[in-house]
C-alpha cells in the first residue's frame, strides 16, 4: 500500500512530528506494509509556492493529462504510483476575502465562492480515479494575531462546509479535520498550538501531538473505517502510546 503526502511547511512540521516512525511501528506490530512518502507540492519553481484550491484545480483539473504541468505531477501520473494520496493547504488559505457575488473558478482570489467551484471540480476529478483513495486536510488556520475576525469566520465556515457537505460518504474521498484540531472549535489557531502569536506554523509540541492522529486517520481510511471515524480526537500529550494503536 503506497501512500503519498503532498505538503508545504505546515505539513512538514507534522511529518517531522513522528509520521514515518508511527508507520514503522504500526507495520511492525500489525504485519502490514503501509509505505508512506512525502513530497513538496507544488515546488517553488517553476510553478510557485502556492497550494490553495485554485492551484490544485489548475494543475489537476484544468491541466490534467499524462504529462506534468510546470514540472508538477498530474493525477494521471500520481495515481499510477500511489494507492492513497493526501493533500492539504498551508495557512494562507484561511486569508479569505468577502464574496463578490460573481464566482469564478479560474480566479486566484481567496473567496469562498471561488473555493467552492474549485472544490466541486476537484471532487469530480478525484471521483474519476476510483482505485485511489484521497484524504484532504481541512485548511490550516491562522492565529488571532495573523488575521481578522471576519476572515477567520469565513475560513471556519468554509472548512466546515468541506467536512460536512463537500465530503460525501461512500466515495473515495475523505477528510481529516486539521482546522478543528488547531482551533478547538474557535475560528483561530490556538496560540498554544502555534509557533508564535504571529506565526501560524504548528509548534513542534503540537506537531508531535497530532501526527499520530493523522497517521491513524490514514490507516482508518485504508482499512475501511474512513466514513465511520471522520472527526479527529483531541490532541494527546503523549505520542508513543498511539504507535501501533
What are these regions (language model features)?
Residues 26-64:
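A short beta-strand-loop structural module common to alpha/beta enzyme folds
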Residues 6-9, 37-43, 87-92, 137-141, ...:
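Active-site-proximal beta-strand/loop segments in catalytic clefts of secreted hydrolases
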Residues 59-112, 139-144:
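Oxyanion-hole/transition-state-stabilizing segment in secreted/luminal serine hydrolases
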Residues 91, 123-157:
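Active-site segments of SGNH/GDSL-like serine hydrolases
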Amino acid at each position: 500500500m503506497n501512500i503519498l503526502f503532498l505538503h508545504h511547511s505546515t505539513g512538514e512540521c507534522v511529518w517531522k512530528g513522528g509520521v514515518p516512525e508511527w508507520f514503522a511501528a504500526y507495520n511492525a506490530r500489525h504485519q502490514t506494509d503501509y509505505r508512506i512518502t512525502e513530497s513538496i507540492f507544488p515546488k517553488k519553481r517553476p510553478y510557485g509556492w502556492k497550494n490553495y484550491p485554485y492551484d490544485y484545480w489548475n494543475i489537476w483539473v484544468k491541466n490534467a493529462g499524462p504529462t506534468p504541468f510546470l514540472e508538477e505531477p498530474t493525477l494521471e501520473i500520481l495515481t499510477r504510483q500511489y494507492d492513497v494520496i493526501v493533500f492539504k493547504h498551508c495557512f494562507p488559505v484561511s486569508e479569505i476575502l468577502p464574496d463578490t457575488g460573481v464566482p469564478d473558478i479560474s480566479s486566484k482570489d481567496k473567496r469562498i465562492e471561488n473555493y467552492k467551484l474549485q472544490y466541486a471540480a476537484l471532487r469530480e476529478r478525484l471521483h474519476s480515479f476510483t482505485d485511489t483513495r484521497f484524504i484532504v486536510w481541512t485548511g490550516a488556520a491562522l492565529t488571532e494575531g495573523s488575521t481578522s475576525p471576519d476572515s477567520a469566520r469565513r475560513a471556519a465556515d468554509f472548512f466546515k462546509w468541506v467536512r460536512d457537505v463537500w465530503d460525501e460518504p461512500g466515495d473515495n474521498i475523505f477528510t481529516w479535520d486539521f482546522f478543528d484540531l488547531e482551533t478547538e472549535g474557535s475560528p483561530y489557531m490556538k496560540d498554544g498550538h502555534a509557533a508564535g502569536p504571529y506565526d501560524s506554523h504548528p509548534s513542534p509540541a503540537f506537531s508531535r501531538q497530532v501526527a499520530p492522529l493523522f497517521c491513524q486517520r490514514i490507516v482508518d481510511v485504508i482499512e475501511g473505517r474512513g466514513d465511520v471515524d471522520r472527526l479527529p480526537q483531541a490532541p494527546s500529550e503523549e505520542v508513543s502510546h498511539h504507535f501501533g494503536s
